[in-house]
UniProtKB/Swiss-Prot annotation:
This is Threonine--tRNA ligase. GO terms for cellular component: cytoplasm. GO terms for biological process: threonyl-tRNA aminoacylation. Its EC number is 6.1.1.3.
Length: 640
């Protein structure tokens, strides 16, 4: 029996899960197994929809541009893309023509039919596709090809190879898709390879969902951290320094400093010990850690130094990660089970050679500072440490205003190459799954998404406009304890290998800065705002009164000042609204007499005749409690 028979009468089912494998409905169900349905509007269903849409995109391009050669075309978080080698770059007009052709293919109801073939057969069928041949030559003996079959004639209209699964036919795609933009990329991300055109699109289960997504995209343009960073004078990325290397200006520096100081305090409260490591090291360390083997393409080239002490000199590298250094700290002295868990933290700056096309503002940079930590634990304390790390993550992100999450669990692909025994992987995966489920958060599986050295869980956080960002990772490592010969002495006096956990709660301060800038649309909560209080005198006669009041804030380390400019008051207010100052105070004659001020908020609401002590207490409470204050109602809630 296949999936079509098993789910007959279920028009909403587009694929199935059996033995933790995603399968086409056309595949046979193993004897004694009961498959789970995958509906179109489920997370897996949307992934399959988008993957099928990528195939239709490629078919449309090749039907219009006969010279187009195929690269790869996966689904993405909200859509899909496909890479093409073409003689001329695609334009916006090209995308409209391609999209029209896609709709024609969708309405023709072509079936997606899977067939497993050997490498020789695949080589023959894709003999005119050089990029596909490169992939075929690097694959195992067999691979699956999906054929688009004409509904009337039964002839093959197009084909591509991939794991699948796919929708039963193109008709299931519907009309809720759109091509969004095109960019230039290098084949396999390597600048030594040919340049290709990457066409992006999005696809959804309904027209309403598509419109909602496109509306969010337009909103995202308004809150783009690159745009706001320039408007608010937060940071820049000067060409003189190089791609992906950021300068934080005074205001941006204040925000980042507040972010770092609070995160450091919370880490200390959670029992982490801060260490520091250099930015460069000899080649030997990264050979020992395996980074040169597994991560070398993402590292900056070496610097040959120390020829005065050695005729050949030594290769030094900018560090891409902090973990090898922390393992040296662990191994610097004998360790007992009494010292574990050992939590080593570092706000360490690392350098990664991202391709120029992948760099994106502060969200993807070449120089980044990670809120990095490595936990060395016994097997007995491993589960508790992972649970604590996850709880700490959720709590800390909540303090910065992110409070909606789901957890992704990345496990290994059974066919891949991995370090560690099957028993170790099964144990670690079980613990991560248990901790994730015990958290009460929604969980999603990411089969095959684990790194070669261990499974991981990642926290995906939802921002104010509905986008999810991968924020925090908690990653098990079977690799470094083995490579660095790490051990501790247990109760019986025997040497045991510690379990090592990598975790970064923000990913990097640069990326988290970008996320918060867009989440708050530049209107940071008062505790993070570079300028927290600005006081405006109606006339110069009111300056001494405001100076006296504003001076009180300095004892609380609150950033407050009096504006001495001679501009008209309405103009000043408009200027500070544009700068997104959380608290704008105004004082005139009546305020001097009554010892009050007027306080204006970002949305234009205000409170007049507010006693200065009450104003002071409210501002201090807003900052101390890390509350977002946009309106009078927000401020009133703090005063209650």
């Amino acid at each position: 029996m296949d999936g079509f028979e098993f789910f007959s009468g279920r028009s909403d089912v587009v694929a199935m899960i059996c033995d933790d494998r995603l399968l086409d409905l056309s595949e046979s169900i193993p004897s004694g197994k009961v498959p789970e349905p995958i509906e179109l509007d489920s997370p897996h269903g949307l992934d399959i929809l988008r993957h099928s849409c990528a195939h239709v995109l490629a078919q449309a391009v090749q039907s219009i541009y006969g010279d187009a050669k195929l690269g790869i075309g996966p689904f993405t978080e909200n859509g899909f893309y496909y890479d093409f080698s073409v003689n001329e770059p695609f334009s916006s007009d090209s995308l409209r023509v391609i999209e029209d052709k896609m709709r024609e293919i969708v309405h023709s109801d072509q079936k997606f039919v899977r067939k497993v073939v050997d490498r020789q057969s695949a080589h023959s069928q894709f003999r005119d596709e050089p990029f596909k041949l490169e992939i075929i030559n690097a694959t195992d003996d067999t691979l699956s090809i999906y054929y688009n079959i004409d509904a009337d004639s039964g002839s093959v209209r197009w084909m591509d190879f991939c794991r699948g699964p796919h929708l039963p036919s193109t008709r299931f795609i519907g009309d809720a898709f759109a091509l969004t933009h095109v960019s230039s990329v290098y084949w396999r991300g390597n600048s030594d390879n040919p340049q290709m055109q990457r066409v992006y699109g999005t696809a959804w289960g309904s027209a309403k969902d598509l419109k909602g997504y496109l509306d969010r995209v337009e909103l995202a343009k308004l809150v783009d951290h690159r745009k706001l960073g320039k408007e608010l004078d937060l940071f820049s990325l000067p060409d003189e320094i190089g791609p992906g290397l950021a300068l934080f200006h005074v205001k941006g520096g204040i925000i980042r400093s507040e972010m770092e100081q609070y995160a450091r305090l919370r880490h200390l409260e959670e029992g982490y010990n801060f260490v520091y490591s250099p930015h460069i090291t000899k080649r030997d360390l990264f050979e020992r850690s395996g980074h040169l083997q597994w991560y070398g393409q993402s590292m900056f080239p070496p610097m040959r130094l120390d020829k005065d002490s050695c005729s050949q000199g030594f290769d030094y590298y900018l560090k891409p990660m902090n973990c090898p250094f922390h393992s040296l700290v662990f191994s610097s002295q004998p360790r007992s089970y009494r010292q574990l868990p050992l939590r080593l933290a570092e706000f360490g700056t690392v350098y990664r050679y991202e391709q120029s096309g992948a760099i994106h503002g502060l969200a993807r940079v070449r120089g980044l500072t990670q809120d990095d930590a490595h936990i060395y634990a016994t097997r007995e304390s491993f589960e508790d440490e992972v649970s604590k790390a996850l709880q700490f993550t959720i709590s800390l992100l909540g303090d910065y205003g992110l409070d909606q999450f789901y957890i992704e669990i990345s496990t290994r692909d059974a066919s891949g190459k991995f370090l560690g025994s099957d028993e170790d992987w099964a144990y670690a995966t079980h613990i991560l799954q248990k901790v994730a489920q015990d958290s009460g958060l929604q969980t999603r599986d990411d089969p095959g998404g684990a790194a070669f050295y261990g499974p991981k869980i990642s926290v995906q956080a939802k921002d104010a406009i509905g986008r999810y960002w991968q924020m925090s990772t908690i990653q098990l490592d079977f690799n470094l304890p083995e490579r660095f010969g790490l051990f501790y002495t247990d109760r019986a006096g025997e040497r045991k290998r510690p379990i090592m956990v990598h975790r970064a709660l923000f990913g990097s301060f640069e990326r988290f800065f970008a996320v918060l800038t867009e989440h708050y649309a530049g209107a940071f909560p008062p505790w993070l705002s570079p300028e927290q209080v600005v006081a405006l005198p109606v006339t110069s006669a009111h300056i001494p009164y405001l100076e006296e009041f504003v001076s009180r804030f300095s004892s609380r380390l609150i950033r407050a000042r009096v504006d001495y400019m001679q501009d008209r008051l309405p103009k000043k207010i408009r200027s500070y609204v544009k700068e997104k100052i959380p608290f704008v105070l105004v004082a005139g004659d009546r305020d001097l007499t009554n010892r009050t001020v007027a306080i204006r908020f970002r949305d234009g609401t205000q409170i007049s005749d507010l006693p200065i002590q009450k104003c002071f207490d409210g501002i201090c409470a807003s900052i101390d409690r890390k509350k977002q204050i946009q309106t009078r109602i927000d401020f009133d809630s703090v005063l209650e």
